Amino acid sequence: VYIINHAEDQYVFLDPDFWPLIEQVAPQCTGVKGWVVMTTAEHMPETAVSNVHCYEDLLAGQASTYECPAIDENDACALCYTSGTTGNPKGVLYSHRSTVLHTYATMMPDSMNISSADVVLPIVPMFHVNAWGNPYACPVAGAKMVMPGNKMGDGPTLAALINEEGVTMSAGVPTVWLNLLAHLRSSGQRVETLQRVVVGGSACPLSVMEEFDTYGVDTRHAWGMTEMSPLGTSNSSGARRHQFDADSFAAIRTNVGQPIFGVEVKITDDDNK
């Protein structure tokens, strides 16, 4: 409720599964002109809330082309709110320029390494720091992007989706990968097309990385912040593992890596020196 009102949102797009929650908070969101449910007419919820729209009905009959207006590169592009801070969430406003620069940086080989040959599955939601930039990087690179929906917490469903869509790269928090690996371990199933996973949000256990090794999957540990669009560092040491002995490589691969292009890092001690 706070974010909707603070951002002065006029239209809110939502998954049908969130409708029970929306019915509770809608009366408190007085600035919202319309609630757009991302579904077809037959799956629309029955509700007494006014100004509810069906996404597919809104699209029906509309032109298939769109003439984009001229936009200054420094104009506002997107607004994303932090969630892990104390106090109220804080909005971070991105310009078109910063978003494009971040997109180029995330596509680089030592970052997420996204190209037109990839099928990308961002398990991290778009409200979690812009799905780590994947919704921007995929169309720029020409990669196929698979939208997982909201039922990706269990290993069997995730493994099935990876195999059905031929996913080559995926991004998510450690819990997601723990669930996937537990399923693969117990079922004997494999994810043959998966080449790399990007892990962030919290520290990735070495055991997860080493188990992914047995499936031929490169694990990349990354770090970022909402204020950084969000990617700040990426660890691509897996491509250079032949340069290290086993113990050294284990220590190196668990850190969050090096700053990506455009990021400046200042390291200080407890005395700010």
Label the model's feature ranges.
Residues 1-24, 90-93, 122, 144-151, ...:
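Short beta-strand->loop structural element characteristic of the AMP-binding/adenylate-forming
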Residues 100-119, 129-168, 183:
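Conserved AMP-binding/adenylation subdomain of ANL enzymes
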Residues 12, 76, 82-85, 120, ...:
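Conserved S/T- and glycine-rich ATP-binding loop of Class I adenylate-forming
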Residues 33-41, 220-227, 257:
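Beta-strand->loop->alpha-helix junctions that form or flank phosphate-binding loops
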Residues 62-74, 79-121, 133, 143, ...:
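Conserved adenylate-forming
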Residues 69-71, 250-259:
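Short Gly/Pro-enriched turn/cap motifs at secondary-structure boundaries
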Residues 1-60, 71:
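Structural core segment of the AMP-binding/adenylate-forming
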Residues 140-143, 167-172, 178-251, 264, ...:
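Gly/Ser/Thr-rich phosphate-binding loop
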